[in-house]
């Protein structure tokens, strides 16, 4: 049983866009070291907005975010925000790779936050960093692709490159924003297996947005469900009953059987 102090604590977090849409409404959440927390909910429920507010890619309207005991939700200093992001890596649905650069160069980009402006502009990486990048590619099973251009890879391989790039930050928290929604069923499990391995073997806490409950039940240690920007469920994957499923996704929704994905 996890009894540690929270790695991440969110208090009364809200986000309202300029057009008046309230994407998040008074979110309160704790995430402990070593958890694999999955956030579920319909498209537009606030899942992506939540993750983007956590690492300040989007500015919260109100509320507090504490990361490793430090309040980061209201910080305005660019250098402090950069420091926070260096320990809070993120991967995205569409990979965000540089298509014409090599796989190895894309992975090395994960070290840019630790570089000076001058080093970043010139892409200066040490031999040790190159060795580390190759090791991270080995960890996600594509070391042999290091010299290929990123646009020569399949979708699943691109996401594994994105994971290897995230590991270059040496994060304590990995945010995964719908990491498998654009992948085929078999590849979904390959990517999710690597995320679980990173979580269990490297001790990196993971927060992932997912759609398919079969994946949630297989990989999550805990689940939070959002609906219209509010948390409507929090608990273990096995506690999502058929009644809860309908409350989260609507009366007409149908679950995806484990054999379907």
UniProtKB/Swiss-Prot annotation:
CDD domains given in the database record: ABC_PhnC_transporter (cd03256)
Alphabetical UniProt keywords: ATP-binding, Cell inner membrane, Cell membrane, Membrane, Nucleotide-binding, Phosphonate transport, Translocase, Transport
SUPFAM superfamilies per UniProt: P-loop containing nucleoside triphosphate hydrolases (SSF52540)
Topology class, membrane: Peripheral membrane protein
Cellular component annotations (GO), alphabetically ordered: plasma membrane
The keyword Cell membrane is assigned to this record: yes
KW Translocase (keyword) present: yes
Reaction catalysed by this enzyme: phosphonate(out) + ATP + H2O = phosphonate(in) + ADP + phosphate + H(+)
Domain called ABC transporter: residue spans: 8-253
Pfam families: ABC_tran (PF00005)
Membership in a protein family: Belongs to the ABC transporter superfamily. Phosphonates importer (TC 3.A.1.9.1) family.
Function: Part of the ABC transporter complex PhnCDE involved in phosphonates import. Responsible for energy coupling to the transport system.
Protein name as catalogued: Phosphonates import ATP-binding protein PhnC
Gene: phnC
């Amino acid at each position: 049983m996890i009894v540690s102090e929270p790695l991440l604590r969110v208090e009364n977090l809200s986000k309202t866009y300029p057009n008046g849409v309230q994407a998040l409404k008074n979110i309160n959440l704790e995430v402990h070291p070593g958890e694999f927390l999955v956030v579920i909910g319909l498209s537009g429920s606030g899942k992506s907005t939540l993750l983007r507010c956590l690492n300040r890619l989007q500015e919260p309207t109100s509320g507090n975010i504490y990361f490793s005991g430090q309040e980061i939700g209201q910080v305005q200093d660019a250098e402090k925000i950069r420091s926070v992001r260096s320990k809070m890596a993120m991967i995205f649905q569409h990979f965000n790779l540089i298509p014409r650069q090599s796989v190895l160069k894309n992975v090395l980009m994960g070290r840019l936050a630790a570089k000076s402006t001058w080093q970043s502009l010139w892409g200066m990486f040490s031999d040790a960093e190159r060795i580390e990048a190759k090791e991270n590619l080995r960890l996600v099973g594509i070391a042999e692709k290091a010299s290929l251009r990123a646009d020569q890879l399949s979708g699943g391989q691109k996401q594994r490159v994105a994971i290897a790039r995230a590991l270059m930050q040496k994060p304590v928290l990995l945010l995964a924003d719908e990491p498998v929604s654009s992948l085929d069923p078999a590849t979904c499990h390959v990517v999710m297996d690597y995320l679980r391995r990173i979580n269990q073997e490297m001790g990196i806490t993971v927060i992932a947005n997912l759609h398919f409950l079969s994946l949630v039940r297989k990989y999550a240690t805990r689940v939070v469900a959002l609906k219209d920007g509010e948390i409507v469920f929090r608990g273990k994957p096995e506690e999502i009953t058929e009644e809860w499923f309908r409350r989260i996704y609507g009366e007409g929704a149908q679950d995806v059987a484990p054999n379907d994905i």
